[in-house]
Amino acid sequence: MTDWKTTITPEERNGNSIKILDFLMQWYPNFNRAEALVRANTLEDRIFNTPGIISKNDYIERIAKKIYAIGESLEAKKAQAGMTNNPQTPNPMPTTPITPLIQQPITPVQQQVPPQKQPQPVYNQQQNQQQNQNQYTTTYPSPNTPQQSNTPPISNNNSNNNSNNNLNNNNNNNINNNNNNNNNNNNNNNNNNNNNNNNNNNNNNNNNNTVYAQPLTPQQQIQQQQHQQHQLYLQQQQQLQRLAQQNQQQQPTIMQQVQNQQPTQQQQQQQQQQQQQQQQQQLNQQQINQIKQQQQQQQQQQQQHQQPVQMPSGVTTNKQSPQPQNTPLTPQQQQQLLAAQQSHAQAQANQNQQLQNPKRISSTNNTHLMPCLPSTLYPTATQQDINNMYWERVSSIKKYIPEIEAIIPKIIENFSQSQNQQPQKVETYKKKFLDFVQMVKVTPETVVPPLNLDELTNAERYLMNMYLSSLSEEEQFKKILGTIDDRSNDNLIHFEKDLLNAFERTKRYFSDTFLNKTGGVTSKAPSILWFKNPALNNPFTSATKCQFSDPIVPKKKQHILLDSWTPEFKKIKKGNYEIFEKDQKIYNNLKKDLIDFTKNDNTLLPAKFIDKDTIIISETINGGDGGNNLYIHFNQCQFSTSWKGSKKNPAMFVCSSPNIQISSDGELFSIQPLCGLSWDRAEIIIKHYKQSLNRGDLISKELSQVISLNRYTIESHLDLENAKFFIQFSTKSTLLLKSKKQQQQQQDEKINNNNNNFYNLSILLEVPNNYPYSPISYSFPPEYQLTPYLKDLESKMNKEFENSNDLNQLNNNINNNNNNNNSFSDNTQLPTNQSIVESLKIFEKVLKDLV
């Protein structure tokens, strides 16, 4: 925690507090700025000390999310306040949550109160009437349908609609004018009086106007009744949501907790706020009881009155319409009507249960009540499960939206330029991107039900594929490691099992050679990583021994014994096994020949067995633990574990016979030439063993001479695959090298000062297997070819070595002539003049010319 906190300066923290302050002052400009700054500082300090933050970026992201959440909550309040028609003015920041009141039914006592202020306009009434009429006309017959001549006139009955509109207007006025209770009551009374006058006028007009209409069929009556019940249910549900938001706001918030920590001057204000909250809770309880009474009254009225019928336009008379005749219902229609009444009664029971527990309802729980379309990806999931998965996917991908929006222009540009697409296709491609982004950026307040989980999943896959394909391999691995770091220990165990199972699946599609060359297979998804089997915890037989007592074994449909023992001959094809049997016979015979040959050689001790498959050969004089003893190991099977070698040095494989390994107690370069031999005869092996010991003694003497000069640092390199031995000599002091041009322009001091180059030069000498009878070869590091000064060094070294080789060839010719005259054998050979020390002398001579 302290590591990332130290990277944040006080100026940055103050800047974040000022951002929160400016955001709050935009909504509440009349509030005291000093007090708002205290609240902003407290909010920033709380985010800074949150235990879940692990980095500076996480802290900045939490600040941004908090500002975004504050903005959403304030916009929601603004949208709720916008439902009323009062002029919107910037309100001061509330110290306590404001609880709107639901308009009580108008009583004669309220109508007699004299008004104290100008009545507010009630133009919402006409709008609500039009909306209600439009809603009802959607399920009624068209006004242009033909009329029957014998249909009696029916009076237009709109009293229920007008009363509902008046109730809605009174509720809206009461919600907006909650802060001034006395004045608002007067205004409400005035509005109620005006509404009553309008209702009277409407009723008079309705009584004077009569129209002709068709009688409703039983099915239309059922549909009309269900529609009215649904509208009434929606109105009551909105009132319940408002009450729930009020009760939720009355609980202690972050701002109130900060005020509790202020000096004693604010304690009096807190007591007043608590009293106001208690009064508001009592008023809310009264309003809940009134809603229950209204529901019962409306239910009784619906049973008494007949369903309203839409009136065709253009037909009016002054006669009063008689009551329509009740047509008998069929048994099927009676069952439908009974089912509709039962569903309405069930909705009323659920609503009453919510009224009894209003505090349990919150705006966040409304997301669980949203209808969802059935998912083809999860056919057995319930509505609640689909709803939860929908919002979990939205929250998981929202953190990538800023990065995705940043790369959208680049992706669209590449799409238009690569294939020269038409502008219409490019716009369609761009619109698809933006639609998917908007689909993911939804909130519970902005989403349009029903929720479609399949559509959201397709959008998520499309955006994530485009986003991950735009990342480099390094960024992909960083995200993979980031997801691993964020997981807990328990999740990492499941994560490890998934990785091992994933690798086991890849072996079905990728060969072992491919996996060994590439080192593994990676996936672009941030939560999947396919890799080569690690040696730490690997349950497969081809891996090293597992360090845990109970290794993780991947489960499949059929049980597979991965660690069960099987004979080696079953793993080898028939042709290969026959070759292996022949080789084993040769090795067994060679082992016996070596033991018999050492018994007859006076310079060597008789070979003896260390274990069943290993023998040791030693010199008579220098034998022992410190000598150049030769260890020979014969593998009995083609798939055995590698031999570790002697106590001091590791084992080396024989190139021609991979089932034979050798090692020594002395320097490995003393027996290195034996790796390049063909091990078929014991006599040849013992002969080359003695020559390699002489070679090793000569190399050790020459290296001791070079070390005594104290001019070079020496490093030896043993190439076991190709059976070669290299020695690298590097100068200890830096040398000033000059090119040919610099040597010609030594009089010009400026050029010498600017172009001088100092180097620690190195030369790599390869010692042949039959040294000293073959000359030393040299090479330079490959980077020397890039420098012009070192190219001159290489060209001069080549000339000197050619001259030395010519001299060596001349000596060999003279030696051959002498051997022929003296009848010596052809196998006699003189040592070469180009030794390790002579090669270094040539190297120093060339350096003097360049320095």
UniProtKB/Swiss-Prot annotation:
Residues 98-141, 155-212, 320-358 have a biased composition (Low complexity). Residues 145-154, 308-319, 359-368 have a biased composition (Polar residues). One of its GO terms (molecular function) is histone acetyltransferase activity. Keywords: Activator, Coiled coil, Cytoplasm, Nucleus, Transcription, Transcription regulation. It is found in: Cytoplasm; Nucleus. GO terms for biological process: transcription by RNA polymerase II. Residues 79-212, 299-368 are annotated as: Disordered. Residues 231-307, 790-827 form a coiled coil. One of its GO terms (cellular component) is nucleus. Component of the Mediator complex. Component of the Mediator complex, a coactivator involved in the regulated transcription of nearly all RNA polymerase II-dependent genes. Mediator functions as a bridge to convey information from gene-specific regulatory proteins to the basal RNA polymerase II transcription machinery. Mediator is recruited to promoters by direct interactions with regulatory proteins and serves as a scaffold for the assembly of a functional preinitiation complex with RNA polymerase II and the general transcription factors. Belongs to the Mediator complex subunit 15 family. This is Putative mediator of RNA polymerase II transcription subunit 15.
